[in-house]
């Protein structure tokens, strides 16, 4: 029997977070772990072709192999480009300072 590791799969929405804990075989991929966790059934809006994933805040590929206990995070797409938001904020501040 292959060694198993305990992992968490996490997906956060603005008002709530889902955290699932499970044991998987050492060497399983991030994608295998996500699918096995059942989180895709709970959150059908997750599309692994679109949503990025990471381990403790560091982006990784779905094919990344898991060798030790970890936390898999599924990220939501950004609603706005951070650079564009900063540009708009700076422009607004500039206009207000001219008044």
UniProtKB/Swiss-Prot annotation:
InterPro entries found in the cross-reference section: Mopterin_synth/thiamin_S_b, RnfH, RnfH_sf
Family matches, as Pfam families: Ub-RnfH
Gene3D superfamilies per UniProt: RnfH-like
Domain of life where this protein originates: Bacteria
Family from the record: Belongs to the UPF0125 (RnfH) family.
Protein name: Protein RnfH
The organism's taxonomic lineage, starting at the top: Bacteria, Pseudomonadati, Pseudomonadota, Gammaproteobacteria, Aeromonadales
Gene: rnfH
């Amino acid at each position: 029997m292959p060694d198993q590791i305990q992992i968490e799969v996490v997906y956060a929405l603005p008002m709530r977070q889902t955290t699932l804990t499970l044991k998987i075989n050492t060497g399983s991929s991030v994608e295998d772990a996500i699918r096995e966790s059942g989180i895709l059934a709970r959150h059908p809006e997750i599309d692994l072709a679109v949503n990025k994933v990471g381990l403790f805040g560091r982006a990784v590929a779905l094919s990344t192999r898991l060798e030790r206990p970890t936390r898999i995070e599924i990220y939501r797409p950004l609603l706005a480009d951070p650079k564009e938001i900063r540009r708009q904020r700076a422009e607004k501040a500039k206009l207000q300072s001219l008044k």
